[in-house]
């Protein structure tokens, strides 16, 4: 199911980066958690939307013109990560792209 979450995050990144855009997938580990980050240089997510992006059917203003997305992917990703006792969050600077971070406990 983690691969499904990665697919959702990568699909979103691909959909919102400009032509010849940049997407970075990074993996790291702390003593207690495994961290996955998907970073892009798309339009970003406004601060006002950061707490809402994981709600069902929510779409930020920058995503409303993208008709191939229905506002379910991030909600599904959130539920899957929660079932694994992990967290998913968005770190963002509007106009500077988005970074989604997944933190999963090692044990």
Which residue ranges define each predicted feature?
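Short helix-loop "hinge" at the ATP-lid/N-box region of the Bergerat-fold HATPase_c
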Residues: 13-14
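Conserved glycine-rich
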Residues: 85-87
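Short beta-strand/loop element within the Bergerat-fold HATPase_c
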Residues: 20-32
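Short alpha-helical Gxxx[C/S/T] motif in the catalytic ATP-binding
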Residues: 73, 77
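Glycine-rich GHKL/ HATPase_c ATP-binding element in histidine kinases
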Residues: 96-98
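Acidic ATP/Mg2+-coordinating residue in the GHKL
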Residues: 40
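Short conserved segment of the HATPase_c
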Residues: 45-57
